[in-house]
Amino acid sequence: MDISIKVTYKNEGLQKLRKAAGLSQSQLAALAGIKVQVLQQYERGARDVNGAKLPTLLKICNALECRLADIITDEETLELLKKYEEH
């Protein structure tokens, strides 16, 4: 699978998670402490969510009631998260 396709799929998942949580982009951006434009870029795949700072990712996950693995696309990071969750 092409990595750009994988990143786009995960970013689309971010949008689906946000909508399932009943949050607008501006609401989620405020909860995560980021600009609406940044969230829009994550959702479109124009900005890689893997480049976000951990506190920002945790705020996004907290607001969406999801795990980091639900929004992270980097395979190495996902493997580390899986190992951490196993312990």
Regions found by a protein language model. Name each.
Residues 1-20:
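A short, Lys/Arg-rich alpha-helix, primarily the initiator
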Residues 34-50:
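Recognition helix of helix-turn-helix/homeodomain-like DNA-binding domains
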